[in-house]
């Protein structure tokens, strides 16, 4: 008997009831909070175009073209001036975004790889958390998408005109222009989705990937424009390592007359290079009426070119102008369709609770160093556009915090209030989106693929001021001071006055290799 006359059994039973009451209250509170969370969890649209260089977005301050719809995202969100990739090539960049892991960890090192879809991905994490998930447009990972309730993707690189799409495993040809069709499929899915759930949509455009086939309404856009030629267009690479002289991505010498420059319909040069079939397969996707419209648009410029008999620097500049017009025409359709998708969100009252990310799989050369394409750790391909807007995100801000596509998965999960797996290798930049400090002090890069364009394999590190690149199969180094040499024209490696910086950067590079578990010849870093 208890001293107050109450039995111990009675006290135990009363404590049991008390504990149960607290437990029921806690469960009720948890259910209530979860329900509120379900209603308030943000929708997320991840927009990624293919090879869209930051130079071709007017919000970045360049005068090449106007992108009003992408610019509006920047006006309503945060624009990053220092967003970079880990491996500047299409498929690997996508795999990094999906996994939050470097290429040597996720297994997709180059465009000849096949993505292991059984591994953990951000789409699976969103789906498991109750989000409805979809991916439309460019995929480029060979294996079928996993972790998506719906997918509708172009096979491989896809085609611009009357492309094939694979919808949940069923392949069919769809009439129309690929950039518009990708948006059609995205909007159609948004219309039909389960509206009781938040959604996570990956919306990936093929454009403006090579070979830059514009939408017919833009065939004559920029016809009267002469674009400024970059001041290092005729770069002789004398101050760089031998890697720069061995590449095959120069506008002057490596663009194909039919495939790239649309100088078919005399394709003897392409036959010699074995590319005539590539051009014909693209052109023959058009209907007869589409071919006629195309010929009427392009034949006059082909005739002018044939009569001009250009050579040397004049020919190189003509190719540059042709390339820029075609590339920027494709960008114009991308911007139009960003506007279409944003208009849909607003018309359906989804804009207030949807986070929108706009980026590219990497940067792209628009004549800098005389190049097209990507791959290098030099700024134009290493750096990528990044704009983020949505609830809780600062508006109209620009930041120079250094972030990387390695951070995207963690940032998306953080924005949705979801747990971040400990094996991801990035760092959420949500603090930056809220106007606080964040990002990285140093970034690690590793490029593996040297088959196409003959760009040597390399690793490197970038800090706020310096960049160190090691072409490890050549055992050649480059060091740049990005404050005094933004164009990366003067290799400082081996100069006595920079020996201390070399050693510091090598030590940091070795540290990053250890952190990310990349064991590429670490002994040579000593």
Language model: regions and residue ranges:
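Bacterial Sec-dependent N-terminal signal peptides
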Residues: 1-40
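Formylglycine-dependent sulfatase
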Residues: 17, 35-472, 476-477, 486-526
């Amino acid at each position: 008997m208890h001293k107050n006359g109450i039995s111990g059994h009675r006290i135990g039973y009363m404590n049991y009831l008390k504990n149960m009451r607290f437990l029921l209250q806690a469960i009720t509170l948890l259910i209530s909070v979860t329900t509120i969370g379900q209603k308030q969890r943000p929708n997320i649209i991840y927009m990624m175009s293919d090879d869209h260089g930051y130079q071709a977005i007017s919000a970045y301050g360049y005068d090449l073209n106007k992108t009003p719809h992408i610019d509006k995202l920047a006006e309503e969100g945060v624009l990053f001036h220092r967003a970079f990739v880990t491996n500047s090539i299409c498929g690997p960049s996508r795999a990094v975004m999906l996994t939050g892991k470097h290429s040597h960890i996720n297994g997709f090192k180059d465009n000849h790889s096949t993505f292991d879809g059984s591994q953990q991905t951000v789409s699976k994490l969103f789906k498991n958390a109750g989000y409805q998930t979809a991916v439309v447009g460019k995929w480029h990972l060979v294996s079928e998408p996993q972790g998506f309730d719906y997918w509708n993707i172009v096979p491989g690189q896809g085609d611009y005109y009357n492309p094939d799409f694979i919808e949940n495993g069923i392949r069919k040809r769809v009439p129309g222009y690929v950039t518009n069709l990708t948006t059609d499929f995205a909007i159609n899915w948004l219309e039909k989705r389960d509206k009781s759930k938040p959604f996570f949509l990956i919306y990936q455009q093929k454009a403006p990937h090579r070979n830059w086939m514009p939408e017919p309404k833009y065939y004559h856009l920029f016809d009267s424009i002469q674009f400024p030629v970059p001041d290092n267009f005729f770069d002789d690479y004398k101050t760089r390592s031998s890697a720069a002289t061995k590449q095959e991505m120069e506008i002057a010498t490596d663009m194909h007359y039919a495939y790239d420059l649309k100088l078919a319909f005399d394709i003897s040069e392409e036959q010699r290079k074995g590319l005539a079939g590539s051009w014909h397969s693209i052109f023959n996707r058009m209907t007869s009426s589409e071919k006629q419209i195309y010929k009427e648009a392009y034949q006059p410029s082909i005739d002018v070119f044939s009569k001009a008999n250009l050579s040397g620097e004049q020919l190189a500049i003509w190719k540059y102008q042709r390339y820029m017009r075609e590339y920027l025409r494709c960008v114009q359709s991308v911007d139009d369709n960003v506007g279409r998708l944003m208009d849909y969100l607003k018309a359906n009252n989804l804009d207030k609770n949807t986070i929108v990310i706009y980026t590219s799989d990497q940067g792209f050369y628009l004549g800098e160093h005389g190049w097209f394409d990507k791959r290098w750790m030099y700024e134009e391909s290493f750096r990528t556009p990044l704009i983020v807007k949505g609830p809780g995100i600062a508006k109209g801000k620009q930041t120079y915090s250094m972030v990387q596509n390695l951070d995207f998965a963690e940032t998306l999960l953080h924005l949705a209030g979801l747990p971040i797996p400990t094996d991801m290798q990035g760092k959420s930049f949500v603090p930056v989106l809220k106007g606080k400090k964040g990002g990285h002090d140093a970034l690690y890069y590793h490029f593996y693929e040297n088959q196409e364009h003959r760009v040597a394999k390399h690793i490197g590190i970038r800090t706020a001021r310096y960049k160190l690149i090691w072409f490890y199969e050549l055992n050649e180094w480059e060091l740049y001071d990005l404050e005094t040499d933004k164009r990366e024209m003067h290799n400082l490696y081996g100069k006595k006055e920079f020996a201390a910086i070399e050693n510091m950067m090598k030590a940091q590079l070795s540290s990053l290799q250890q952190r990310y578990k990349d064991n590429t010849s670490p002994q040579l870093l000593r």
